[in-house]
């Protein structure tokens, strides 16, 4: 990172704790902080920003698919979450990231937001984004949630 002055983070999140883009943000923030660089987050609407739901992650269960003690559906934008990570001291050794968030214009979290582009090949539409917080809980079980089909996170079944 020696030849880098600033890192720009422009990735669409879906507002779910185990959607690993927020873990990637966390690791980027640590790398930027450790190298005394600046991070700019281009904030984006959260398609699940209109509600907060689910248990808060307990620290002894932290992993890449859950790094922060937040509810499953956290209601924050990626920029708000970056600010929270910084202010709560969740980065390694409680380091602080030189962070600037470019806010979203005219964003209202009470309005259900449809993403113009799919955030991931695994979340192809609004229905899959809406069902992801609940159906993803079955992902490490023998239950199928449509992975490898055109209806990922929209169907549930037993492959036997």
Question: Language-model segments: which ranges?
Answer:
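Conserved anion/nucleotide-ligand pocket segment
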Residues: 62-134
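A short, aliphatic-rich alpha-helical micro-motif
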Residues: 1-2
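Glycine-rich, charge-decorated loop segments at or immediately adjacent to ligand/cofactor-binding or catalytic sites
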Residues: 40-62
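Glycine/threonine-rich flexible loop motifs
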Residues: 14-25
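Internal helical hairpin/lid segments
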Residues: 129-160
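A short helix->loop->beta-strand "cap" motif at the edges of active sites that frequently abuts
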Residues: 34-38
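Active-site-proximal beta-strand/loop segments in catalytic clefts of secreted hydrolases
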Residues: 10-12, 42-45, 104-105
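Structural motif
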Residues: 5-6
């Amino acid at each position: 990172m020696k030849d880098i002055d600033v890192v720009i983070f422009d990735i669409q999140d879906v507002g779910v704790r185990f959607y690993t883009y927020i873990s990637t943000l966390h690791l980027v923030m640590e790398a930027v902080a450790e190298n005394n660089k600046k991070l700019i987050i281009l904030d984006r609407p959260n398609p699940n920003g209109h509600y907060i739901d689910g248990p808060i992650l307990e620290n002894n269960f932290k992993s890449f698919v859950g790094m922060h003690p937040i509810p499953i559906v956290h209601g924050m934008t990626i920029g708000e979450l970056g600010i929270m990570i910084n202010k709560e001291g969740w980065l390694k050794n409680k380091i602080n990231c030189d962070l600037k968030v470019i806010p979203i214009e005219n964003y209202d979290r009470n309005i259900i937001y449809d993403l113009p582009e799919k955030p991931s090949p695994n979340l192809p539409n609004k229905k899959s984004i809406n069902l992801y917080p609940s159906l993803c809980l079955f992902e490490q079980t023998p239950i199928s949630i449509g992975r490898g089909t055109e209806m990922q996170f929209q169907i549930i079944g037993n492959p036997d």
